[in-house]
Amino acid sequence: SRGLGDVYKRQALYEGLNEKGLMGGQLYYRTFAHFAPEARPGTLPLQPPFLVTWCLATCASVEEVARALEERVSLVAIPMLGTVPPIHWMFSDRTGESIVVESDRDGLHIYRNTVGVMTNSPGYPWHRTNLLNYPQLRPLDYGELAWGGERLEPCFSGSGAAGLPGDWSSPSRFVRLAFLREHAVKGGDEAEGVSLLFRLLHSAAFPLGAVELTGPGEITPHDRGVVPYDYTVYSSVLCAESMRFYWLTYRNSRVRYVELSRLLKGDRPLQFALGEEPEFCDVTGEGV
């Protein structure tokens, strides 16, 4: 499998894909995540940060992931690096099927991701229901309005999306991405699709300095170059057909990719630089 994560002595992938076209990723699920202290009888105990790695190594489809979570593995509250990360997951496959996996105090839940979007807390059902608060959103501009007996002619575009939340909270990002995913013009091929998805993800990315942490906690040796802000370190797009993992970073908007099909015969793990230094293309001498 190919993915992004911190290796240390064991591989814990934040997200990735495998040779069968199964894709998975995890996101922060603060306050709501809860894991059992021990495994169910007859199941494998699994620390939450290793779920993506385990599923990509053993499953070929979303259906197999769901079945494994129900029958083969238990997510248990065993600390990793001194803590149990509060996380939840999303898995998709080549059929277009997608699920959200959330472990709460009342048990493990697997939801079919019909909206096609996932952010952070609260849980997926809450975010989906919250869309009912935005029935007015549409891509079509509103026409003339009557006020005080006068007709006011529109003088700008975008009025159909008036009320679309623009802050960086997870509920607002969910609504924003759900609207964009529903109405954005789909790409005609993989290159166009990848470019479109990065444009959509950019609308939900955290600019450095816009979201200051209220309680960053104790700084540990693992916090290299830590800053007191929440920001989008990287954005990624995965393609199940080409088995490509595309990404760009906060400081470098040049899109890079790794193609898993060209690495399948390898016999050792590989790491690739994120490419965080800015790159600019000088075309001064190319004018005609």
Language model region names:
Residues K9-V117, P122:
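Structured, non-membrane catalytic/scaffold regions adjacent to prosthetic-group chemistry
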Residues S1-R2, L27:
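N-terminal domain-start signal
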Residues G3-Y8:
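Short, small-residue-biased leader/transition segments that mark boundaries at the very start
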Residues P79, P85, R94, G116-V288:
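C-terminus-biased signal that marks the final domain/tail of proteins
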